[in-house]
Amino acid sequence: MLKRINLLREFSIPLLAGVLTALVWANVAPDSYHKFNHDHFLGPLSFHFVTNDIFMAFFFAIAAVEITQSCLPGGDMSPLNKALNPLLATAGGVVGPVGVYLALNSLVGSSAFTNGWGIPTATDIAFAWLAARLIFGKNHPVIAFLLLLAIADDAIGLVIIAVFYPDPVLPVAPPWLMLTAAGMLIAFILRRKQVKSYWPYLLFGGVPSWFGLFKAHLHPALALVFIIPFLPHPTREVKHMFEEDPKDYSPLARFEHEWKIIVDFGLFMFGLANAGVGFSAMNTVTWLVFCALLFGKVTGIFVFALLGEKLGFPLPQGMGRRHLLVAGIIAGIGFTVALFVAGEAFTDPVVQGAAKMGAILSIAVFPVAMAAAKLLGIRKRGHSSS
């Protein structure tokens, strides 16, 4: 049974099921879907609010765990020179899509679409990991390179959401951020007191942080990102990203272990709440997002990684330029975070729906990457041509 559950999580089945359910529902009975998503669901709160503003706080918290662990001595981002090439590639994976999006928008788009520049900066960690494993094999160095890139991408994405996509209706109210600062101070004190359960950090640090962001009209889904680094953890990391250390019983490790399965299956809710767009909603912004993900990602990542080589920061051993090219294509799968940003970038439901469709269509990058790998003679690790 456990093996089947892990298989469902590994292939992101809950998220895909939520997306497909939302697409069918929104196209067959759009009024019913809209009513379910935006009417009262939990008391006065809508299903969309519960999903995007409360549940997604735990999604971003899991990303924050990986970033925190990766920065520890022995982690994938430590020492920094080991991570410089993938980090430079990450910068290219942001600059490239933004450049392609804005350039195409100036040629064939509209000023109404400009705010969507942040959508194609995201890389979906789960789908990128799955695609890389299927193309390269389980232990290929591309896996670690791509995961590090995706995690760093998420960190940049969090900054983009927080800084560039505040509430479009209500102005930012900075004084309320004192609540978030208070939550961080409480978490710091709990750590100094060596509190070993993660629950006090969530309740006494996370809740004020959430309300502070909410009242400041910034996105409360980022609330736990400010708290997670305070959870006690080992002074040294002995595993790679998304692996588990059976000897690590720290609050940080327990939080990830106990909440990751909830988040993985809860992504059904996210897909259901955010992917319900009509196929008729597709317009120019759909293709701006899709093309920026497909062409901008691979171009930016490839060029910046090669620049890193020229500066003396080589690719990981066993990873060549053809592997880099395919990794750049895989990174064009935006999906989860791209859907989230699309919901924040546009208030017009027609434009928002079209942008979300571009994020959903980015899953088509997967077969493009597989075809490119075949053309370049790449096989799963263990074959002589890999």
Swiss-Prot record:
Molecular function in Gene Ontology: sodium:proton antiporter activity
**Which organism is the protein's source?**
Geotalea uraniireducens (strain Rf4) (Geobacter uraniireducens)
- Keywords for this entry? Antiport, Cell inner membrane, Cell membrane, Ion transport, Membrane, Sodium, Sodium transport, Transmembrane, Transmembrane helix, Transport
Q: What does this protein do?
A: Na(+)/H(+) antiporter that extrudes sodium in exchange for external protons.
**One Pfam family recorded for the sequence:** Na_H_antiport_1
Q: Where in the cell is it found?
A: Cell inner membrane
Catalyses: Na(+)(in) + 2 H(+)(out) = Na(+)(out) + 2 H(+)(in)
Q: What residues form the membrane-spanning segments?
A: 10-30, 45-65, 84-104, 116-136, 142-162, 169-189, 261-281, 287-307, 323-343, 358-378
What are the BP-aspect GO terms? regulation of pH
Domain of life according to the entry = Bacteria
- The protein's name is Na(+)/H(+) antiporter NhaA
Stated family: Belongs to the NhaA Na(+)/H(+) (TC 2.A.33) antiporter family.
Q: Which InterPro entries match?
A: Na/H_antiporter_dom_sf, NhaA
Transmembrane: is it a keyword of this entry? yes
Keyword Transmembrane among UniProt keywords = yes
One Gene Ontology CC term in the entry = plasma membrane
Membrane topology, as annotated, equals: Multi-pass membrane protein
